[in-house]
């Protein structure tokens, strides 16, 4: 993505929301299997995939902010206000 002259952060297209949704579906399906059939293998696979998606997504956020310089002071202030208002 080319560097723009605006004060907000435009993210690149990312596969992590789709993978996170698939991991959430796998986790809930694993919970159903665990409740009904006492089999926790699918639940463990779902939780492991959720953990891997979280780690990879956070790695990408750190790379965008630290190495690519996308988190300018104005963007950091906006992120801070967003967390406070949340």
UniProtKB/Swiss-Prot annotation:
Stretches in topological domain Mitochondrial matrix: 1-15, 67-86
Gene3D superfamilies cross-referenced by the UniProt entry: 1.10.287.70
Broad class of enzyme this protein falls into: translocase
GO biological process terms, semicolon-separated: mitochondrial electron transport, cytochrome c to oxygen
Residues exposed to the Mitochondrial intermembrane side: 35-40
Chief location category: mitochondrion
Catalytic activity, EC: 7.1.1.9
Membrane among keywords: yes
GO molecular function terms attached to this record: cytochrome-c oxidase activity
UniProt topology in membrane: Multi-pass membrane protein
InterPro entries: Cyt_c/ubiquinol_Oxase_su3, Cyt_c_oxidase-like_su3, Cyt_c_oxidase_su3-like_sf
Catalytic activity, as annotated: 4 Fe(II)-[cytochrome c] + O2 + 8 H(+)(in) = 4 Fe(III)-[cytochrome c] + 2 H2O + 4 H(+)(out)
Classification via Pfam families: COX3 (PF00510)
DNA-binding in keyword set: no
One GO cellular component term: mitochondrial inner membrane
Keywords for this protein: Membrane, Mitochondrion, Mitochondrion inner membrane, Translocase, Transmembrane, Transmembrane helix
Top-level taxon of the source organism: Eukaryota
Function noted in UniProt: Component of the cytochrome c oxidase, the last enzyme in the mitochondrial electron transport chain which drives oxidative phosphorylation. The respiratory chain contains 3 multisubunit complexes succinate dehydrogenase (complex II, CII), ubiquinol-cytochrome c oxidoreductase (cytochrome b-c1 complex, complex III, CIII) and cytochrome c oxidase (complex IV, CIV), that cooperate to transfer electrons derived from NADH and succinate to molecular oxygen, creating an electrochemical gradient over the inner membrane that drives transmembrane transport and the ATP synthase.
Similarity annotation: Belongs to the cytochrome c oxidase subunit 3 family.
Quaternary structure and partners: Component of the cytochrome c oxidase (complex IV, CIV), a multisubunit enzyme composed of 14 subunits. The complex is composed of a catalytic core of 3 subunits MT-CO1, MT-CO2 and MT-CO3, encoded in the mitochondrial DNA, and 11 supernumerary subunits COX4I, COX5A, COX5B, COX6A, COX6B, COX6C, COX7A, COX7B, COX7C, COX8 and NDUFA4, which are encoded in the nuclear genome.
Name of the protein described by the UniProt record: Cytochrome c oxidase subunit 3
Organism placement in taxonomy: Eukaryota, Metazoa, Chordata, Craniata, Vertebrata
């Amino acid at each position: 993505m080319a560097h723009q002259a605006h004060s907000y952060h435009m993210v690149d297209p990312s596969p992590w929301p789709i993978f996170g949704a698939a991991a959430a579906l796998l986790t809930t399906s694993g919970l159903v299997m665990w409740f009904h059939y006492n089999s926790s293998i699918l639940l463990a696979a779902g939780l492991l995939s959720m953990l891997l998606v979280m780690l990879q997504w956070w790695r990408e956020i750190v790379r965008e902010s630290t190495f690519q310089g996308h988190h300018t002071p104005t963007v950091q202030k906006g992120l801070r206000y967003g967390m406070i208002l949340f």
